[in-house]
Swiss-Prot record:
HAMAP family found in the cross-reference section: Phosphopentomut
Enzyme class: isomerase
Extent of the signal sequence: none
Function: Isomerase that catalyzes the conversion of deoxy-ribose 1-phosphate (dRib-1-P) and ribose 1-phosphate (Rib-1-P) to deoxy-ribose 5-phosphate (dRib-5-P) and ribose 5-phosphate (Rib-5-P), respectively.
Family recorded in the similarity comment: Belongs to the phosphopentomutase family.
UniProt entry keywords in alphabetical sequence: Cytoplasm, Isomerase, Manganese, Metal-binding
PANTHER family on file: PHOSPHOPENTOMUTASE
EC number: 5.4.2.7
Descriptive protein name: Phosphopentomutase
Cofactor(s) annotated in UniProt: Mn(2+)
Cofactor binding note: Binds 2 manganese ions.
GO molecular function, one term: manganese ion binding
Length: 407
């Protein structure tokens, strides 16, 4: 059993449009480069928070910019001015058919999603009538509000007051395979929201919907705010993932943030919840202080996606990247000789792109540790190469079905 592995998923941090991006309406998307260029133009200054060019010295030192240049071919930075990266660096291409959170995470853990998710059409009353009527009946509701594609923050501003007055939850979707339910934590009840989400999870299975998401909020009309009590009710992966194999082998699999939800709580030995990227980083550091040899610490940093990518907040995304970057030395200080850290993403969500949806992009693949030398691993043809490499390092008895190790 060799060392430990820590995986940091920078949710939505793509580094260049995939070759098939046009099929998804995402030709030209590049989350990193477009944020970098916006900062360079002075468009991401926030009084008292950040100013000027994007500053990611630690990620750059691990090969982020080298990987991004290889991914897109865009000469957005002079690589000759940078030091040789201190770790493995490259980029990966998604084989799954979607550009969503479960697809990216499952593929990373060795299970590409080769089937088509179900989606709801972008029109008024977008959900099947039988689904909504059965949902109302089984949940004993007076009705529902919304029933359309919408931004989660906008729809609670639009319908939150009516929701409180009528007791009708707000149901909506997006370009992802999701059925989302928003409700006020106090007026409707947080546990009640979770209960109706569980009912919805069973009802949407026949439509091949990837996730039911509880979207609780608080506040009063004009100042509603989503809380950190979100829960994702995902359909289980179709095959065993890296997490399952590790758990079966007696390893600790410590899921931080929404990781456990993404894998439908399968293959997880410990769940740690935290709200916000910095709290998630704190939880990761705490886990690494006590995680035993042979274990996996797996964290999803959701704010990049939910707070900045979807909301097309370029300056906020830039600031979040810099906050993440400055914490990396704290993690490095906790690494034992045989530990490895993997940094990746699950899809893109270019905040400069039209709309509010994910973008089909390559992801960065960065790996470092006390005994890891510098190496360009090039283009990886499947996110599962990450999982296969983790399996090899942790000396699992048998390799994953998908993916090629780059160790």
């Amino acid at each position: 059993m060799t060392g430990r592995v820590c995986v940091l998923v920078m949710d939505s941090f793509g580094i260049g449009a995939s070759l098939d991006a046009a099929r998804y309406g995402d030709a030209g998307a590049n989350t990193l480069v477009h944020i970098y260029e916006a900062c360079k133009r002075g468009e991401c200054d926030i009084d008292g928070v950040r100013k000027g060019p994007l500053m990611l010295p630690n990620l750059a030192g691990k090969g982020l910019y080298h990987a991004a240049m290889a991914s897109s071919g865009l000469p957005f930075i002079d690589l000759s001015a940078l030091a040789i990266p201190s770790g493995y660096y490259g980029y990966a291409v998604e084989q799954s058919l979607g550009k969503d959170t479960p697809s990216g995470h499952w593929e990373m853990a060795g299970v590409p999603v080769t089937f088509e998710w179900g989606y709801f059409p972008d029109k008024s009353y977008c959900f099947p009538e039988e689904l909504i009527s059965e949902f109302i009946k089984q949940c004993n509701l007076p009705g529902v509000l919304g029933e359309k594609h919408a931004s989660g923050t906008i729809i609670i501003d639009e319908l939150g007051e009516e929701h409180i007055r009528t007791g009708k939850p707000i149901v909506y979707t997006s370009a992802d395979s999701v059925f989302q339910i928003a409700a006020h934590e106090e007026a409707f009840g947080l546990q009640r929201l979770y209960d109706i989400c569980k009912i919805a999870r069973n009802l949407v299975d026949k439509y091949q919907i990837g996730r039911v998401i509880a979207r609780p909020f608080t506040g009063k009309p004009g100042s509603f705010k989503r809380t950190g009590n979100r829960k994702d009710y995902a359909t289980p992966p179709p095959e065993k993932t890296l997490l399952d194999f590790l758990k079966e082998d007696g390893r600790e699999v410590i899921a931080i943030g929404k990781i456990a939800d993404i894998y439908a709580h399968q293959g997880v030995t410990q769940e740690i919840k935290a709200d916000g990227n910095m709290a998630l980083f704190d939880a990761t550091l705490s886990a690494m202080k006590t995680a035993p040899q042979g274990s996996l610490v797996f964290t999803n940093f959701v704010d990049f996606d939910s707070s900045y990518g979807h909301r097309r907040d370029v300056a906020g995304y830039a600031h979040a990247l810099e906050q993440f970057d400055v914490r990396l030395p704290e993690l490095e200080a906790l690494l034992q000789p045989d530990d490895m850290v993997f940094i990746a993403a699950d899809h893109g969500c270019d905040p400069t792109f039209p709309g509010s949806d994910h973008t089909r992009e390559h992801i960065p693949v960065l790996m470092f540790g006390p005994q890891v030398n510098s190496k360009f691993i090039g283009r990886r043809d499947c996110f599962a190469d990450i999982g296969q490499s983790i399996a090899e390092h942790l000396q699992l008895s048998s390799p994953l079905t998908h993916g090629v190790s780059f160790l």
